[in-house]
């Protein structure tokens, strides 16, 4: 139902107009504009996947080039901003809530420390991107994209005016979205709402947006179904992954895996067990790029494993979030990464010339945050 609800946000053009308004206001101050734009994608991707914004890539590239920057900055605003929101996962329904439910944790629990992680990663990521942008603005030859002109016509087909003004209707759409998300978080933390309750809120969100957009019942239903179709693959992967998990459990294979991993993690110094679990999830993500699929396969294993070695289950879920999320922005098998790079006309090899240092920084920052989570006994067991 989340896909169906957010379909109305996309159809309304509210996010597109909001971005265009911000760009027009701060276009002469790169150090302000870039963090503002990445923050938009960070906040939205706390609840949605980055692949939602594949169509945004051409316009962000145009914006970057208009400011004397390169296409990497344009796609980086989407990818890096979205990476922080998705990977820390304070409100993510396809990863965090799935993992917490499998781990036996209250939905959206631990949101306070997750928001701290989000802010830390956001600051580090924006510093990296702004420094890069200012460097290549001063000396364009330092850009990995220097001299690459293939496919630039595709990016120039759109402009800011294509998104239209920020109307009262579009503002109402964004208010409805924010209000529904706040209700979901509040209900989960206060009343212990589960996945069925979340689904009901998404339905109400869709209904209110359809009324705001003055859609006919038939049109609203068609749009809702079209949005749900985008989530079918993720839902199918979760079902298959849960089936695999059930087979592993029934055959007592999962017990053997947990026992073996416990020996590995026990050999690691106690203070580094959280980072070790983070690294394990990074490796697993190479083979299972779906966040919900990885949650369904990994959490039934790492949750009892965390109990064995004395790490809270909340820390194990956070290690899964970060390990699954950040790795997606270097893997050529990631649909979100390759889709946005393709739309922005940025070759994968040139993206990696820019990205590899930031990924190493993410690994270090993530490891430090895992150590802190372990030290404070993060969240309920």
Model-flagged regions — what are they?
Residues 1-16, 193-256:
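Core transmembrane alpha-helical segments of multi-pass membrane transporters/permeases
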Residues 30-45, 69-87, 110, 119, ...:
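Alpha-helical transmembrane segments of multi-pass membrane proteins
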Residues 19-20, 52-63, 93-103, 292-305, ...:
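Re-entrant/interfacial helical elements at transmembrane boundaries that shape
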